[in-house]
Amino acid sequence: MNKLVKTLLLVGTHGVAVGGGFALGIYLLPILTAPESPAVEVVRSTADVAQYKGEFRRDLADSDALHWGEGDLFIGPNSIAFEGRLAPGPDYRLYLSPKFIETEADFEANKSEMVQVGHVRTFENFMVAVPESVDPAKFTTAIVWCEAFGQFITAASYQ
């Protein structure tokens, strides 16, 4: 083997290793740094006073093997609780929308009509406080969105 081929092979294999490590780090870092998920009892206490209920499903148009959520969503006057699982990822946000959204294109096109409720920091169950300025009754859909990569994760219609 000549020296050029060896050098190209070395650079190629090391590049793949570095790229794979970087991708694995992006995937694992949110999992490793996530706070403890709220207990099911805490989520269910919100469910008991919820005004609305929805369901995150895996079968939405832009949900895929890396971007999905499934479980029950409970919308109360002061908090939104989720009992279920989300695909792990960085910088998830919970939005409320006046219309059902299930694609990235629709999210971007309608973002001006939505309100960001807060950060989603756990991937099994979550609780998000509803700011006083937000009235969930004025919306119909909750959406989990990855702000860092502009990725649709999941959505639930609740009224």
Description of each model-found segment:
Residues 78, 85-87, 97-100, 147-149:
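Solvent-exposed coil/turn segments that connect beta secondary-structure elements
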Residues 27-76, 106-112:
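Transition segment at domain starts
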